[in-house]
A protein has these predicted regions:
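Short helix-initiation/N-cap motifs at beta->coil->alpha
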Residues: 63-65, 80-91, 137, 172-186, ...
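Bilobed "Venus flytrap"/periplasmic-binding protein-like clamshell domains
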Residues: 34-37, 57-73, 105-106, 127-176, ...
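Acidic, polar ligand-binding/catalytic clefts
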Residues: 73, 78-144, 207-211, 215-216
Length: 221
């Protein structure tokens, strides 16, 4: 069965496409982390158009969820979010557990062997998130992170960008952005590489955080 991956390519573009539905019922099952605000997150009720997360009493919301609802409607289906870890998304799709993915993912040649990518719906850029009272709060360039302990999410292109930070210490990649925020606040890391929407969300939610955006930033692709 042909699968189409709905991929949110963070930093470059977000992809969308239509898939053959793997399940012969009333639901369109969409895989996502539900942990990458403002695109997708987990909440405790169905307020503001949230969609039920399969197998739980929780709900997912965000830009990706709203798009998923529209796609499901166009296909005559009801949306059902399947909360899935990052590394489990493609296996869930290829095994038929889900019908599509909406998640931050680069369309690499290796991934294209298993899934198909659609056109984008959003363009973003990589930035840094630091502590407002930390040693790197006044950074203005990629060269200002000497000795900084920096990480990003496991399996995403953002982690590979750390090598462009001159003198930075590349820490072990982390599972999700909630984990990185906690590590940053506690001082385990000095910064992490993110995308502008996520960093803005983190900065707005926690006054201890500061987003660093560069005039001459990371080279991507």
């Amino acid at each position: 069965m042909k699968k189409t991956l709905f991929a949110l390519l963070t930093g470059l573009f977000i992809c969308l496409g239509i898939t053959q539905v793997a399940h012969a019922d009333d639901y369109l099952r969409i895989g996502m982390e539900a942990a990458y605000a403002p695109f997708n997150w987990t909440q405790e009720d169905d307020s503001n158009g949230a969609v039920k997360i399969d197998g739980t009493n929780q709900y997912a919301n965000g830009y990706d969820v709203q798009i998923a609802k529209k796609v499901a409607e166009d296909l005559g289906k009801k949306p059902l979010i399947v909360k899935t870890s990052w590394n489990g998304l493609i296996p869930a799709l290829t095994s038929g557990k889900i019908d599509m993915i909406i998640a931050g993912m680069s369309p690499t040649a290796e991934r294209k062997k298993e899934v198909a990518f659609s056109n984008s719906y959003y363009t973003s850029e990589p930035v840094m998130l630091v502590r407002r009272d930390g040693n790197y709060a006044n950074a203005t360039s990629l060269d200002d992170f000497k000795d900084a302990k920096v990480t990003s999410q496991q399996g995403v292109y953002l982690y590979s960008l750390i090598s462009q930070l001159k003198g930075a210490k590349q820490e072990t990649a982390m599972g999700d952005f909630a984990q990185m925020r906690q590590a940053l606040e506690s001082g385990v890391i000095d910064a992490y590489v993110s995308e502008r929407p996520e960093a803005l969300t983190a900065e707005s939610a926690n006054s201890k955080f500061k987003m660093i955006q560069f005039k001459k930033g990371f080279e991507v692709g």
